[in-house]
Amino acid sequence: MKRKIMACILAAALGITGVSFPAAAKTVSVGKNVKNITVNVKNPLDELRAQEAAMQQQEELEEEENMPEQDLDPLVLDNDGSEDIQTADGSISGELPADFSEGTENGDNGSEELQLQQENGNVENVAEPDNNKADEGAGQAQTDFTDDANAAGDFSAGDASDGELGTYQTVTLEVEEGQDITAPWNTLFLELKDQATDENPCKIIIPPGNYELTGTLCMYSNMYLYARDANITKTSTTKHLILRLGNTKDSEGGYDGYRNIVIDGGTWDYNYQCVENKDAPGGFVGFCIGHATNVTIKNATFLNNLKSHFLEFGGVKNAKITGCTFSGYYKNYVEGGQECIQIDCCTDESNVFPQYRPYDGTTCEDFVIDGNVFEDVFTGLGTHSMMSGKTYKRITVTNNTFHNVKKRCIRFMNYEDSTAENNTMVNVGNGVDISSVSSNTHQTPGYDDGPDMLKNRNLRVAGNYISLARTTSIGGIAWICSGIKVSGYNMKKDGAVLPKKIYPVKGVTVEDNQISGYGNGISMSLTDTDTVTDNQVTMKKTSSYSNFGIYAQDSRGSVISRNTVSGTANTGIYLSGSVYAAGSEQRNLVEQNTVSGAGGDGIYLQSVNTSSTAQKNTVKSAAGSGIRVNAGKNNNVLGNTCLSNKNHGVKIEYVVGGVRVKSNRVTSNAKSGILLWKSKVSEVSGNRAEKNRGNGVYAYASVIPVMKKNTFCENGKVQAVYVKSCKGWTGINRPSCRVVTSRSTAISGTASGSQTVIAYARRSGKQTKLGVSSVNKKKQYVIKIKKQKKNTALKLVSKDKYGNTVTVNTVVK
């Protein structure tokens, strides 16, 4: 009940139920200048906490939906590990004899005889061609089926792309159009099991046609399945595996159970529509591959999944999935996050990967997932369970297309040395999700410690195109879309496997991605030395929650540079600090970014207590301030350009020390150029504030040791520098002057806060100094000049003892 109440509260907070939820706002009044510091925008930190709480609810709904124990795998060994084979009708038969001529399908007394054959009935040894040309003979004679672009690499003993193949034994499975393929397949493959060797692997051809499937298919080492133009449709009503390696759960373990497997082609329709009790707990995995080395699945189409994975790998090394299509899932099932391609670990804890023994914790390494299509599915590929002390290594996801993916496209959990690059994702709930660990962590046998929280993950997300859907809720709980999400994990109390501590994500590079649509662009939390560069983030404002362009929450050593961000409902680029980042010597850098049209502040550093710098950024047309620093310390705002923002150009508030505001240009902002509010700053120098509607600098109750060499021009308020309750400082007004005519021989007026006033004349693009005057105790000045022609442009520049200057322009009458 508490969870349901919390879900309702969160839904209301995020606007999911249509109930209005007041935005966090701050309105501060100080005398006549109240309108300079009145702010009404959503508090980014509160907004992010609400979003994270909602997504935590989603995580709790995503429970693994593995096959129920009562649904045995037809034609696979029973759960007791016996040596017998279970037939499709559930009966148990003894071991198959050497003479397979009496084998029948589905337990019938049919007369079909299964045999090895070439075209004329014998096995043929076919030499693998030396060239690398693509197979163009899918419709030719059977002897042509051995040609393949990557065949030499598919059975390599080392990397998936290396090695040479000897000869194939080419075999054609004898089946008729519309026939149940289960028993003929398992009979033939079992006979070939001992004949297929590393030197002479077997290539089995399924002829083009349409076939049914009523049980689990078994495949063994050194086998190449060629199934192009074959359509295999599951017609059984139970939930069972479609295909596995071996006919028993037991193997040698590690990566040594099976080797050299190729599945080439076929349309595999899992046909969830035929399954009884679809809404009961559990789905069924399609192809389940475990404890294996050198596995290739290519050119295949997988359709209509029921609450689980199309392909599942556990403890596999050197795998390639290329040129495949995954489409269709049971849409009534919204709680889970089962991936089309699941990269998993060998453990039976929580029913994670029960199909292969031993449960030794072996993870996956050296995967290439390239050129596939994922369409109208719940989740694309990745991992949602892990082993303590082990990682998934060298997973490469490139050149894939994701379209209409409800949740995540790519999920890297506990990965290292891995890449997601040049993928296209359109109308998706999340592009790339990277996380260090999760509560779904299992104990590795013989390992008693937790994950290595100092490990450099060396992960790269680059060159992807991501267009986010307008999804606001899934299963009645708010869903927050994100283009790229990088998350550490805060284990707040000791668990069964994970000890209490913070597990950051270290060493992630996010670069050259294009992100658009509804949701957050790039988000990071509890990260360490991660880099976000050269990305284009073009968001649309959402009605249900307030989205961000790029944010780094409680992170150390983040570099956010050369990105373009626009259109967010909240802050364009946001950094916030907390427990993990506090006191870190690693510097956060926000540099050379362009932010426009943000619904909140352009760049916002909130409660950041580690050394952080925002420099050389351009921020324009934000609904809040251009650059804002709230609380925290040791932050720098250097060399930025802030123009046409609806609040201040630069806003500094409640900081406790070590903040420098230097060499910024703040222009045409709706309020003051620079606001200093109840802050301890180190330096305000070298800034240029012009054409702002308020003051050049507005300072209230702040400590300012140095304020020098700032330039103010054509700001709306008389006070170029407005100071109140700032010890040791007085305001600086712009110089005023009496009317200057063509007969005038002097320019006179007042210049409060300045020491001198200089007059210049501008003619034909050239500037000539006319004279200078000191300012007396009555704040008056008189500059003697020669008579000037009518309509001559004059410029008056006042300067105080710290080199701060105020410029006004006038014309000779």
Explain the meaning of each model-derived region.
Residues 729-813:
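Ser/Thr-rich low-complexity repeats and stalk/linker segments
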Residues 185-196, 212-221, 252-253, 310, ...:
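Short, T/G/N/S-enriched strand-turn elements that build extracellular solenoid repeat scaffolds
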Residues 16-35:
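Sec-dependent signal peptide cleavage junction
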Residues 255-404, 409:
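Right-handed parallel beta-helix
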Residues 177-186, 200-240, 268, 302:
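N-terminal extracellular ligand-recognition/capping segment immediately after the signal peptide
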Residues 30, 37-39, 144-187:
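Right-handed parallel beta-helix/beta-solenoid
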Residues 212-216, 234-240, 272-278, 284-285, ...:
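Short glycine/acidic-rich loop motifs that flank beta-strands on beta-rich extracellular proteins
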